[in-house]
Amino acid sequence: MPILYSFKRCPYAMRARMALYLSKTIVELREVSLRNKPQSMLEISPKATVPVLLLDDGRIIDESIEIIDWCIENKKDMFEDTLNKDQKLFAEDVIKLFDEKFKFHLDRYKYATRYENVDAASHRDACLDILRTLDKNINNTKCFFSNNVNKIDISVLPFIRQFRIADPLWFDANQGIPNIQIWLENFLQSKLLNVVMVNFDLWEPNNPIKLFPTNL
């Protein structure tokens, strides 16, 4: 059985857990403390970040998008819709944008005190500009391309969720992102998010095995 080292609130680990749930892949979940990472995790992934997926054959996958892609490869019908070439390219471009730019600004908005000479409001506005552009690509559907979740949805959801958490009242006001707001609210109320955000006790080597997901 694969083993997933995870941390509940980490957006990258959330990506991995959503992919595992949607692909109906059962793993042993090891919830870790980011301040006291287990030696068994550090030995297989020296970069010391979650998620880390240890496969049955000994392979290590320690990038969230690569875990999503592994799940897709092993569960061809993981997503109900088959995307066309343009949709696939759009999805990959948006995911790259979030990983390289949105996350950069999000950290400096949400955790401004950790950085020197940072104007949190300007980084918040940079995130909002990205969301306003993205908002035009959701039109009367629950997800980006249809009413069915796809790779792009689970890849950007954790970061948009964090963006809202930083100031919910501000986010929920009229910010020019009505479709994104509806899209996010749909996910916040979804079974998918409820499953992936379930609480797990911190893993210890002698603890009983905890399986994820538990309610397929």
Language-model segments: residues:
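GST-like domain detector, emphasizing the conserved glutathione-binding G-site
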Residues: 1-131, 135, 139-142, 212-215
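Surface-exposed helix-capping loop/turn segments at secondary-structure junctions
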Residues: 136-147, 192-196
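Catalytic cores of nucleotide-enabled group-transfer and carboxylate-activating enzymes in metabolic
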Residues: 133-137, 157-158, 162-164, 188
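Extended, well-ordered alpha-helical scaffold segments
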Residues: 122-127, 175-189
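Charged/polar, low-hydrophobicity segments characteristic of intrinsically disordered regions
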Residues: 186-205
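Small/polar glycine-rich anion-binding or flexible loop at a beta-alpha turn
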Residues: 148-150, 179-180, 201-203
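Acidic/histidine-enriched, glycine/proline-rich intrinsically disordered or flexible terminal extensions
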Residues: 200-216
